[in-house]
């Protein structure tokens, strides 16, 4: 409630614009978030904005595409900070980034970060301004999956310093954990992609992968 006066909440009956001042707040220390709760009467009395999205697109899909882009940016920042720390931190007379074990962890981080970056770009690709649901599923699933691995490796390399309040790494990794769950975790979006393959596609798995990941037609259209 320090920034927003109202929040748009999606529930079983649709969407409601709910004032933050009327909510019961519960601080969530792990992610530096606040959990907001409203009564059923408050939800029924709140205005329901008329949000019309094209092509059957729902708010969760739109939100997931945006959060995937946020995750990709945060993942890159965590990786760059960790790489810089590994080059600066001296142990046994040389930077810890010279040790093979640290180099291996950095290499794995890099794979996750750049895979998430490409997936997030795929989630934003399309012929219009609104994302395609299956591409968003790929983007959010891959970025959420990377969040766990990158946060774990970053804190392993930083050691205890990464958890301190004075060091900004924990601000970024808290966001990774929070955004991983926002609009559906990787498990949810894996299910969306699987359902598209089983129920909504007549060709082979490879055909679906090609049609989903090939953005050249969108660029030339």
What are these regions (language model features)?
Residues 1-80, 206-212, 216-221:
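FAD-binding core of flavoproteins
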């Amino acid at each position: 409630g320090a920034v927003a006066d109202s929040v748009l909440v999606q529930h079983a009956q649709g969407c409601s614009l709910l004032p933050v001042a009327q909510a019961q707040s519960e601080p969530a220390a792990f992610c530096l978030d606040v959990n907001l709760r409203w009564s059923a009467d408050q939800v029924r009395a709140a205005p329901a904005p008329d949000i019309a999205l094209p092509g059957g697109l729902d708010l969760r899909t739109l939100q997931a595409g945006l959060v995937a882009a946020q995750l990709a940016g945060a993942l890159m920042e965590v990786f760059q900070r960790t790489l810089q720390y590994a080059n600066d931190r001296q142990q046994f007379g040389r930077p810890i980034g010279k040790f093979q074990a640290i180099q291996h962890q950095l290499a794995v981080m890099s794979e996750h970060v750049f895979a998430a970056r490409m997936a997030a770009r795929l989630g934003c690709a399309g012929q219009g301004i609104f994302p395609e649901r299956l591409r968003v599923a790929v983007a959010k699933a891959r970025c959420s999956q990377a969040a766990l691995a990158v946060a774990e490796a970053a804190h392993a390399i930083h050691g205890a310093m990464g958890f301190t309040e004075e060091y900004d790494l924990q601000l970024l990794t808290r966001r990774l954990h929070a955004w991983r769950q926002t609009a559906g975790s990787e498990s949810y979006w894996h299910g969306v992609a699987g359902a598209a393959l089983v129920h909504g596609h007549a060709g082979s798995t490879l055909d679906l992968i090609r049609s989903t990941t090939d953005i050249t037609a969108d660029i030339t259209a």
